[in-house]
Amino acid sequence: MARQKKMGQNVLRAVFFLVLGLLGHSHGGFPNTISIGGLFMRNTVQEHSAFRFAVQLYNTNQNTTEKPFHLNYHVDHLDSSNSFSVTNAFCSQFSRGVYAIFGFYDQMSMNTLTSFCGALHTSFVTPSFPTDADVQFVIQMRPALKGAILSLLGHYKWEKFVYLYDTERGFSILQAIMEAAVQNNWQVTARSVGNIKDVQEFRRIIEEMDRRQEKRYLIDCEVERINTILEQVVILGKHSRGYHYMLANLGFTDILLERVMHGGANITGFQIVNNENPMVQQFIQRWVRLDEREFPEAKNAPLKYTSALTHDAILVIAEAFRYLRRQRVDVSRRGSAGDCLANPAVPWSQGIDIERALKMVQVQGMTGNIQFDTYGRRTNYTIDVYEMKVSGSRKAGYWNEYERFVPFSDQQISNDSASSENRTIVVTTILESPYVMYKKNHEQLEGNERYEGYCVDLAYEIAKHVRIKYKLSIVGDGKYGARDPETKIWNGMVGELVYGRADIAVAPLTITLVREEVIDFSKPFMSLGISIMIKKPQKSKPGVFSFLDPLAYEIWMCIVFASIGVSVVLFLVSRFSPYEWHLEDNNEEPRDPQSPPDPPNEFGIFNSLWFSLGAFMQQGCDISPRSLSGRIVGGVWWFFTLIIISSYTANLAAFLTVERMVSPIESAEDLAKQTEIAYGTLDSGSTKEFFRRSKIAVYEKMWSYMKSAEPSVFTKTTADGVARVRKSKGKFAFLLESTMNEYIEQRKPCDTMKVGGNLDSKGYGVATPKGSALGNAVNLAVLKLNEQGLLDKLKNKWWYDKGECGTGGCGSKDKTSALSLSNVAGVFYILVGGLGLAMMVALIEFCYKSRAESKRMKLTKNTQNFKPAPATNTQNYATYREGYNVYGTESVKI
């Protein structure tokens, strides 16, 4: 009896627990476990990890105030390009009896999935791009960007830009932009980049747009494609100041912007995940501690915004079923879930209740406030607007449906001109004599007082005119500014301006096209050109016959022939002119018949040569022409010798008192033709860029040599180049700006010199960042200083007044000095030679005369022994005398 009573109590207890279990299983028909589906594509690895982790977080952090239910999931992977794979994946989920499906779609799979959901009343929660179509049972976690984009386009006043869009994301934004373009007269160039596989095609598009002078781009793509486009932007160097890129993507911090930010371009984007949100911070703290093997792309990869949307989707699903549980809605699925391919389709009866509950959810997630309209689209959300600066990304404002775009107060970046009086302007410069130098006692000084030089004075004058406070900052890498061909990053002073580390550059910075593209220049404050510096050659030793140098050897030969010609003409004129003949004087006493008669004409051939030589030497002669014709010859010869001797005397003083240096090269052509003397330029400067870009044959040949020379002919600094010139013993030439060349030529040890003319013509300018309001004020200040003549005064002060080589010192190739024996040695040689020749001729004359006199004495003795009869025929004697005069063999009296 007792046993039967005990058995009855056990049965009642079993029935009680059975009823209790049934009540527990169905709180108003609500199950303990909610099964949800997951559809993932290939490139959603991190999103899959976030999906599983979010479910795990919910199951381990349930609200104890309500009867808990667990979330369970079934995951399928689909190939969006295969419609059978998409259908099979969805039907697999539906056959498992899932209450809702989370998943991704693209342009190819969207219609298939949404059609199944609408036909079978199965809710599909997705973080994929939103659609404008009014589809049922699709809950879109991703907010629409159309309104935010149009607001920013109006805020930045874009009237001409390029729109690069992904066709997989739909055409809704394209349509909205084109409608706005018609209303606002915008010039929009739209290009679809969704189907581009070759990265070279992106490059060609950017190059084409750049030829059209396009500087503004709106890029509407997923993160991966945006990264690819920006990579080509960096390669082409289109990420410098003046370019503006607006990224129509909700994951601004997911995009790789490290390389782009160094270019100076303005980059604007949108961010749906607020990293300052405590929920986000708490999630990330747990996220980074996950096991990478169980949750791929969790620990070592930053959290994507699509992963945050995935987490929020689980919150929405959980909140919807909590609501259904509170409302005691029966959502239990009993029996078979049915066939998704049945014809006609058999929808799930509780699907409408679940869809309605999902759309009624309002919860705070990692992406902010989450609400939906009647079509399952996000509403009442806020999107942060970010801007990328050289210092990093910053939040510039926010956008919502009611206030539109709201910029933060500090986003109104100070116009340099408006705030310049209240802040200290950073003036970047470079240590380069005589532009900027340390003072001798600079260690005892502070601030700008430590420096001196041309640019130091120029910066002071500009600041005085513009009325700004400034501090000088020496560029860290010691370079003027060039863009790296691989990274496209600017270095030197140009980089300081491009990346916002300086406000003005006052330095010997050459105005070039590539620099003008990224920074602004004032009018040139100094004109110059590329010049050649060589080591000053040794002074040439004067030759023995250097006194002949004032006249070319051709002139000396002409003078010799002219003298001979004049002598011959004078001889002939004297022969034919009757006024050059002497008349016989009958009153004279008869001479010795043995002595030769006096010649009646003094200008024989030897006397004519003597006359021309005496006139040329400006010493005169004891005979002169008597006839008019002879005097004409003498007059023109005297005039000729006057001009020649005067010119010779004028040049002789310069040639004998000036020491000349023979330069091995005189021009760039000389450098290009030879191989003994190496030549190079400053590395990373405008001079090197000039040769690299030049199309002139001579300069192309020089560039080909310089870039292949071993060891390298490029120097890091100008001082290194000058030192190399001085140590090379004339075997290295340095190509640099003419102003620097002239300055170094005036500095000790005065052993360099500038040769040839300038290879080009350019100027130094004061540089400011692109678009800086300081640019106009600085430009006006430079023009005013030029008109006042202050720029010339500064150059004279630092180039010549402080020169160390004297007036004209090292800057002159010729140096006047006292004559040395070597200058006039040839004259002494000729004197000694002439004296020796005279003594030799005198000896010959003496010997000849002695021999002739001996013969005459013998003849006289013979004559005395034989006395012939006196001459009776005087007529014959006269005839003899006349013939002697005409054909006489002697022209000089003895």
Curated annotation (Swiss-Prot):
Domain of life: Eukaryota
Phosphotyrosine sites (modified residues): Y877, Y887
Single GO cellular component term: plasma membrane
Cystine residue pairs: C91-C340, C750-C805
Membrane association type: Multi-pass membrane protein
Catalytic activity: Ca(2+)(in) = Ca(2+)(out)
Record localization: Cell membrane; Postsynaptic cell membrane; Postsynaptic density membrane
InterPro entries cross-referenced by the UniProt entry: ANF_lig-bd_rcpt, Glu/Gly-bd, Iono_Glu_rcpt_met, Ionotropic_Glu_rcpt, Iontro_rcpt_C, Peripla_BP_I
Extracellular topology ranges: 29-552, 649-823
First-listed, main subcellular location of the protein, grouped into a coarse class: membrane
GO biological process, any: protein heterotetramerization
Coiled coil: none
Other remarks on this protein: The postsynaptic actions of Glu are mediated by a variety of receptors that are named according to their selective agonists. This receptor binds AMPA (quisqualate) > glutamate > kainate.
Subunit structure as annotated in this protein's UniProt entry: Homotetramer or heterotetramer of pore-forming glutamate receptor subunits. Tetramers may be formed by the dimerization of dimers. Interacts with PICK1, GRIP1 and GRIP2. Found in a complex with GRIA1, GRIA2, GRIA4, CNIH2, CNIH3, CACNG2, CACNG3, CACNG4, CACNG5, CACNG7 and CACNG8. Interacts with CACNG5. Found in a complex with GRIA1, GRIA2, GRIA4, DLG4, CACNG8 and CNIH2.
Primary role: Ionotropic glutamate receptor that functions as a ligand-gated cation channel, gated by L-glutamate and glutamatergic agonists such as alpha-amino-3-hydroxy-5-methyl-4-isoxazolepropionic acid (AMPA), quisqualic acid, and kainic acid. L-glutamate acts as an excitatory neurotransmitter at many synapses in the central nervous system and plays an important role in fast excitatory synaptic transmission by inducing long-term potentiation.
Protein name: Glutamate receptor 3
GN (gene name): GRIA3
